């Protein structure tokens, strides 16, 4: 079968080509913001439009185009949707066994203030999960926990998506940074150092931003000491670990340091006014706490599903475990690799997106045991045994989880179908090249390339795999540091996570907002654009003024 070469400028004018390439994305924005379509409807129509652009404008062969859509849809089911199914199952086990009431009480005993609960659960615990697992699990788990604590589901999902900005670049044991190094031949350690000199600024800003969203300027004034402790300790640990240890552990170290510092601080300090959403006043919370006291053993038992989850996900993420399932590993036979018919190595990526013409691999990996979702399922099984849940109740709970998540799973599949047709047709690369044509202003627009990549794929890792090489090439053309531009792709990417259709679908699934994706998208989109502009300003200053910050 002939190799089909991607053409990134079919119109003969990069700006006109990029305008046509952007049609599916513009429709998706319009469908969610103005038409207020349900997520699965918007995603389905977006795939249809992307297919039309790929076939009619890019002249992609029909079999390649359809194969990329099917490949993307199944990738959405496994491993992405599998993570969400397992994560929601763990949460439901906690609720069904009555343990979540104790979890709620234990958090309330640290602080009844929901602004500070957001810092503890959404930020610290979420960052830890991002460092260990990534790929949607942190938002799903923390948003569900916050709903259980009395948060409005839309706010819980939206705030968790926004606060997840801080740890994404170093997520899943630093995979985004490591991939950026692999595709650019740059030192991953240096890229990690550079990201560690950009993200700490954004981390503290994001936490103050969250307080303002929740409770306005009054909230910022009342919580700033706690924000400085949580954000400051995280930012310092993030800088030190990324610059002196490596890109694998900044999230794990920073989140634990921040959690310990914040918890100890809240033993001594509480805001003057206790903030809660809705009508539940501080006095009612205090009365609830006064009536219910749990032993340390009861609290540890209640938290056991999430302790098991943390342990299994961390075990699954460490290099020796991963090496077992890598090519040449002892358990590599457990991984089922299926080359995608009519697509695998039948599409060629072309310069300047890559250094030389490269056949685009398309191999569907069914890693039934080594997938993160399976690690979370093991945590669920351990929880069932430890909490003495009846097998019939566990099976019923798993069944209800699948039933509730049926539409979100379809949405996630269609979102990934759109991402894959965009990548294999060259549509996403056309948009990237248009941004790279902005000349010396590219330092400002560079993070938008990472933002675009994460919007399309839902992953900072995938964004770097797509665009890091292009960032390095553009940097050399305009005479700025390639390490800085590749780092900007990573840092800019974190700001796109909160509006990625994949992330939106996952968050809605976790908090029971199926069909309300348009509401959540409208909640996060302005914050995403503002943060990306901030990263653009930081990157430009580092490129032309603060050059001493570049390793």
UniProtKB/Swiss-Prot annotation:
**Where is this chain primarily localised?**
membrane
- Where in the cell does this protein reside? Cell inner membrane
Provide GO CC annotations from the record: plasma membrane
- Recorded catalytic activity of this chain's protein: (S)-lactate(in) + H(+)(in) = (S)-lactate(out) + H(+)(out); (R)-lactate(in) + H(+)(in) = (R)-lactate(out) + H(+)(out); glycolate(in) + H(+)(in) = glycolate(out) + H(+)(out)
Q: Which GO terms describe its molecular function?
A: lactate transmembrane transporter activity; solute:proton symporter activity
Can you tell which superkingdom this protein's organism belongs to? Bacteria
- The disulfide bonds in this chain are none
Q: Which named protein is this?
A: L-lactate permease
